[in-house]
A protein has these predicted regions:
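Active-site glycine-centered loops adjacent to acidic/histidine catalytic or metal-binding residues
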Residues: 28, 63-64, 103-104, 183, ...
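Extracellular glycan-associated modules
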Residues: 292-457
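Short acidic, glycine-rich surface-loop motifs adjacent to enzyme active sites
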Residues: 172-191
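A general structural motif
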Residues: 20, 56, 95, 174-177, ...
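N-terminal active-site segment of His-dependent metallophosphoesterases
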Residues: 1-77, 189
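A short C-terminal boundary segment appended to hydrolase-like catalytic domains
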Residues: 263-315
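Extended active-site neighborhood of metal-dependent phosphoesterases/phosphodiesterases
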Residues: 2-11, 70-177, 195-219, 227-265, ...
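Residue-level marker for buried hydrophobic side chains located in beta-strands
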Residues: 23-25, 59-61, 100, 180, ...
Length: 457
């Protein structure tokens, strides 16, 4: 990184606890045009990256560097040249390597794929036909695999190869840290959804994610949806960073320009999300630490004083454990596990099961007069015993309502179409277990047994 960054006000980078890796994730600038709007917004985010002390070991760019999407190869090459020589000219790429993911603005046909190979010269260790498009990098105990989520040889946007991915993960099974990078998400973000155009197509998605889970991948890092988002599915994080300069938000009023500074060490992953002014807007430590037994408290059946009021601050979460037996088959009613409320207002939080499939559901109310947002998870099997753990983790935004079964199960985020989550919830002063705020007959739990405990961290 150029020494010029020393004149900026420094931003202290997170550092590994002992040996590890310190790096930056960002993407989606749609620039490469001199004097364009996105050139200015990208410069603002780059100014933040340049203030990081110490500088990152490497940078992962999740795609859409340039506006692209042109049939003219010379125009496309000129955009790449402007982006590399002028917009990223401050960076010493020999000292701080940058690895790029393919994307819909940069690799949209065979011509643009060839251009990507030529101008970026990424490693040529990918599957046949995808050399320089899909590839892997090994740095000590870290493996980073880049997958092409729009290969022309497989069908274009939203299509991704999986056999090679599985082979590379098997070959490098000894890597302590495994990251996979691709442009398109697998799981919808902020309610913006659509197979192929916004996520990897359904004929690939399940196999793709199962490979990540089975190989012990820590995170799939993506972009495309103009937001920062984190969620977890079967223990694997999906981290979306797509705010490096494109002057649109998904949605406006919630999302913001940003970059992500992250570290990996023997204890896991930590990151901080910095906006274009250098302010830390979001952060996370993963995996979730196990809570000691003394943190857990039984929540009595019926109505009681809440164990938590107000908002969850950074790093804080609420853990619930629900044990019992599900209602019999044929039960269709909404059934309450726990409700949090204040007298005279609709409960801002309801946790329970709904419908004939007894689907785990969390409902968070927002502003008065506005519809609440719904999160959906697994089904409870009729009449079966269950040991359900549920977490409200403000640092994960809309991905921060998580569940698992048993102490050793893998965490998964409940699915939602919201751009916000428990971080905006003002926890009220009353809780009720086994029924909702209206009393004993209000959406009561219909199984023969239910016990609840909670821990605040």
């Amino acid at each position: 990184m150029s020494s010029e960054h020393q004149t900026f006000e420094r931003i202290h980078a997170l550092l590994p606890r002992g040996a590890g890796h310190q790096f930056v994730l960002y993407g989606d600038t749609c620039s490469g045009v001199s004097g364009g709007l996105h050139e200015r917004t990208f410069a603002a985010v780059n100014a933040v990256v340049r203030r990081l002390v110490p500088s990152p070991d490497f940078i992962v760019f999740t795609g859409d560097e340039i506006v692209g999407l042109t049939a003219d190869p010379e125009q496309l090459r000129a955009q790449w040249q402007h982006w590399l020589a002028h917009e990223m000219g401050w960076l010493d790429r020999q000292t701080i390597p940058v690895w790029h993911a393919t994307s819909n603005h940069t690799t949209y046909n065979e011509m643009s794929e060839a251009m990507f190979r030529d101008v970026l010269n990424m490693p040529r260790n990918g599957p046949p036909g995808q050399e320089g498009l899909s590839y892997w990098v090994r740095r000590g105990d870290l493996l980073v695999i880049f997958v092409h989520t729009g290969w022309s040889g497989l069908g274009g946007e939203g299509h991704v190869e999986t056999e090679w991915l599985q082979g590379v993960l098997t070959q490098h099974a000894d890597a302590r840290h495994k990251l996979v990078v691709g442009h398109h998400p697998v799981y919808p973000i902020n309610g913006f959804s659509g197979s192929y155009q916004r996520e990897i197509g359904p004929e690939h998605a399940a196999t793709f994610w199962a490979i990540l889970v089975d190989a012990g991948v820590l995170a799939y890092i993506c972009g495309h949806i103009l937001a920062f988002d984190v969620q977890v599915h079967r223990g694997v994080l999906q981290i979306c960073t797509a705010g490096a300069g494109t002057a649109h938000r998904m949605p406006d009023g919630v999302e913001y320009l940003h970059c992500v500074q992250a570290v990996l060490d023997s204890e896991g992953l930590r990151y901080q999300v910095l906006d274009e002014t250098g302010l830390v807007r979001e952060r996370l430590e993963w995996p979730i630490r196990r809570l000691p037994a003394e943190r857990w408290h039984t929540v009595p059946a019926g109505e009681s004083r809440a164990l938590l009021t107000g908002r969850l601050g950074p790093g804080r979460f609420v853990a619930f454990r629900f044990t019992g037996q599900a209602a019999a088959e044929g039960t269709n009613h909404a059934q309450t596990l726990l409700s949090a409320f204040s007298p005279g207002i609709l409960a801002p939080l309801w946790i329970g099961v709904r419908g004939p499939r007894q689907i785990l559901t969390a409902i968070i109310g927002g502003q008065p007069g506005r519809s609440p947002h719904y999160w959906h998870g697994a089904e409870l099997q009729p009449g079966a015993r269950f040991d359900l753990h549920l977490l409200a983790y403000g640092d994960m935004g809309p991905g921060g309502i998580l569940y698992r079964f048993g102490d050793s199960g893998r965490w998964s985020s409940l699915v939602a179409a919201s751009a916000t989550g428990p971080e905006r919830l003002d926890w009220p002063e009353r809780w009720s277990v086994g029924h909702a705020q209206g009393g004993l007959t209000d959406r009561r739990f219909l199984g023969p047994a239910l016990t609840v405990s909670a821990a605040i961290c």
